[in-house]
């Protein structure tokens, strides 16, 4: 297999403010694996939170590309990708996820099967995705919520964690009034302490919020589990549930775990977490980083396995360089085409 990569800028339509930062753009590194005239693609995006810049991602993807060159075909490379003793093991999960994406895309094209078929789903997956509304003024949030509801969105996720919690309550009230029939998720991104969370959770429950992601600062999963046992709302671990061992510690102790492929290491790792938590009382959420359609697509092929879907990262972009998973009407869909089913907007379809 031959490999090449390209680094691109992904600009957001408008800056997205969350409790710990405001983001207006991020870089993405695209991996292109070629074998016998077919191409498979993967994407890794930069993350200040996880300490990944474009140079680091490019270096690590290049190292993995050198390793991949030693395999006769993508199928054998995919089998070896999860080997803990392989050269380069221990690289950031985002890199492994991008390599796995490219291999799955390539294997699907070689076999004529879409990725969801490779993963055991007989039918093309589709699901209502949440759409994120950042920390902003209530009237701005209300206008956005009304627009999204009119376009078909049935799930909205409102960011929280303002210095004054009253501002978050006002924002959620405004969103609820503008879109009374949508399901509401809330995400403080770890901004609350235990006492604040205990005070606020009943108030947000009264506003019709369905579930809350990561209310407490990450690093104390025992405290999160303690809060979940007392909460009137389902709590979904995100920053406290990075990989399999984190999920194992929290299974049955929180109501949900937000699995992001860039956080856990890809589709295979996500499936292992889903199997681990099944039947424990902890449900699966599929989330994402802000990324292009290429970066979101692998998770869309898993969308039938989750209770909550938050795969809107590509919808936040001013220009998504890839297409193939929908989402603008509130529903993401896996294509029935071989592989990931995505293609570049600026190019003719490649094999």
Predicted feature descriptions by range:
Residues 15-20:
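Short, P/G- and charge-enriched loop/turn segments at secondary-structure junctions
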